Structure formats: C-alpha cells, structure tokens
C-alpha cells in the first residue's frame, strides 16, 4: 500500500514538473521527434551538409539517427581520400541495423571525427554538432544547389512517412 501511494505521488509530481517547464523546439521538425536545422542542406538519403568557407561538414540527420536507434559503431574513411556525390563513404551500425552513409557532395576528405570511434553515441546525442562525420573540401560546390533546404527536407520526411503507412 505504501508503495502504491509513493508511486502515485511520484507520478503526480513528474506530471506537474514537466507541465511547468517551458518547451523549446527546433525551428523545423520532420516528425514530432526529429529536428531539422536552418542553415544546413539535406540529401534525400538523410545526410546533412554545413558549408562554411572552403569546407563542408557532413553527418547524418536527426531523422536518420532516430530511425536507426542507439548507434554502437561508426566506420569512417581516411583523411586525404575522396568522396563522390551519392556514393557511400562509411557506415553507421546501430542496435537495429547497419546503414551505409552517402556523401551529398563530391570532394577531398580533409578531416574525420575521430571521437566517433570511441563514442559513436555522439551521433544520437548531437547529430548536428558533436556527431558530425567528415569534413570535405568540395570539388564541385554547385552540387550543394541540388540539396534540400530545411523546409523542403521537412516536407520530404513527412511525405516519406506518409508513404510508409
């Protein structure tokens, strides 16, 4: 009986504390739980690109990591190698599946996120910041023009989700 009273009061306290906190959400969302950030470009294979100066940072989207589940291993390419648009450069292994990661653009790999080797879960915790995968010097910057902006990617995800049901 005491356990039931404790559980009831704890549940009530949790409802009250979560109801009183302000709710912050990203600018865009694919589904109710997947963030889509402004200022990035997106591929229909669910990778993102952040182009700054002569370097483009690439990773998988929040939508992709959400569908994969807990990431347990990341395969990354070598610095100095090259990537080709729409071609695989690595893989992400989760508790659910292993997925190839495609490059949204072509170019030379100038940096890889070596933190992912020891802490692959960074992709789940921070797909757009700490969970980036590679940095590339684009060989054809105009390829960025063929990628989706945040609004287009959000619509793409919604349509993809509707088609799956």
UniProtKB/Swiss-Prot annotation:
The modification N6-lipoyllysine is found at residue 96. Its cofactor is (R)-lipoate. InterPro entries: 2-oxoA_DH_lipoyl-BS, Biotin_lipoyl, GCV_H, GCV_H/Fam206, GCV_H_sub, Single_hybrid_motif. Pfam families: GCV_H (PF01597). CDD domains: GCS_H. Coiled coil: none annotated. It is found in: Mitochondrion. Residues 55-137 form the Lipoyl-binding domain. Residues 1-31 form a transit peptide. Expressed in roots, stems and leaves. Binds 1 lipoyl cofactor covalently. Its main location: mitochondrion. GO terms for cellular component: glycine cleavage complex; mitochondrion. Transmembrane segments: none annotated. It comes from the Eukaryota. One of its GO terms (biological process) is glycine decarboxylation via glycine cleavage system. Keywords: Lipoyl, Mitochondrion, Transit peptide. The glycine cleavage system is composed of four components that only loosely associate: the P protein (EC 1.4.4.2), the T protein (EC 2.1.2.10), the L protein (EC 1.8.1.4) and the lipoyl-bearing H protein. Belongs to the GcvH family. The glycine cleavage system catalyzes the degradation of glycine. The H protein shuttles the methylamine group of glycine from the P protein to the T protein. This is Glycine cleavage system H protein, mitochondrial. It comes from Flaveria trinervia. The gene is GDCSH.
């Amino acid at each position: 009986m005491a356990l039931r009273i404790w559980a009831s009061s704890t549940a009530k306290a949790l409802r009250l504390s979560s109801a009183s906190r302000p709710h912050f959400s990203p600018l865009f969302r694919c589904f109710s739980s997947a963030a889509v950030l402004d200022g990035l470009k997106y591929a229909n294979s669910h990778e993102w690109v952040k182009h700054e100066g002569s370097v483009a940072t690439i990773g998988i989207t929040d939508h992709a990591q959400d569908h994969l589940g807990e990431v347990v291993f990341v395969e990354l390419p070598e610095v100095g190698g090259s990537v080709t648009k729409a071609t695989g450069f690595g893989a992400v292994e989760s508790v659910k599946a292993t997925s190839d990661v495609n490059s949204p653009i072509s170019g030379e790999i100038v940096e890889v996120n070596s933190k992912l080797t020891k802490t692959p879960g960074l992709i789940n915790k921070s797909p757009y910041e700490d969970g980036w995968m590679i940095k590339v010097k684009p060989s054809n910057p105009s390829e960025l023009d063929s990628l989706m902006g945040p609004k287009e990617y959000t619509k793409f995800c919604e349509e993809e989700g509707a088609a799956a049901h």
